[in-house]
Regions:
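Short beta-strand edge/turn micro-motifs at domain boundaries
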Residues: 109-141
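Residue-level signal for well-ordered, solvent-exposed loop/turn and beta-edge residues enriched
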Residues: 41, 104, 120-121
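Short, low-complexity N-terminal intrinsically disordered segments enriched in polar/charged residues
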Residues: 1-34, 38, 144-158
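Short, surface-exposed coil-to-beta transition loops
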Residues: 74-76, 105-112
Length: 158
């Protein structure tokens, strides 16, 4: 038996997903960042390494507040596995662009590696992906968005 139960890690991972969904919807990434321990490390293959909860928060808040992150509000999980002996969670995360107006789905995935600390906290995250795979997906999304008639959202409700 590991240090943590599978149920404890599953619940922490479920909370991680809930907070990512809420933060993607609201634009406030503080609740999501608060899942990390104060000394957590985050490795992001395009942006580099962040050390500490506050550095992770500053990075995620800025990244998801500017394009293209600001148009990427959903992060559904395709699959996940848990190693309860060591406290690891591995998952495939879709980085999904908002609906461009025609209902089409534009997304690209990364593999996320999480290390569970305890008390619902995460001490390590690494997102492994090829940034070059995102460019064609975003280009296709932009093409559809440009051809979709403007709705009240793009006219400020006028």
């Amino acid at each position: 038996m590991g240090r943590w139960s599978r149920a404890e890690i599953e619940e922490a991972f479920a909370e991680y997903q809930r907070r990512a969904a809420a933060s993607g919807a609201s634009g406030d990434w503080r609740p999501w960042a608060d899942l990390f321990t104060e000394d957590a490390r985050y490795v992001e293959h395009l942006y580099g390494r962040m050390e500490g909860r506050e550095a992770i928060y500053r990075w995620i808040q800025e990244t998801m507040s500017t394009y293209p992150g600001s148009d990427m509000p959903e992060f559904p999980i395709e699959w996940h596995v848990i190693d309860e002996e060591r406290g690891w969670v591995l998952c495939q995360v879709w980085n999904r662009m908002r609906d461009p107006g025609d209902g089409s789905v534009h997304q690209e995935y990364n593999i996320t590696i999480l290390h569970y600390a305890e008390d619902g906290r995460i001490t390590y995250e690494e997102d492994a992906y090829n940034p070059a795979n995102f460019a064609p997906m975003i280009a296709a999304w932009l093409e559809v968005e440009a051809m979709t008639p403007c709705t009240s959202a793009c006219t400020g409700g006028m």
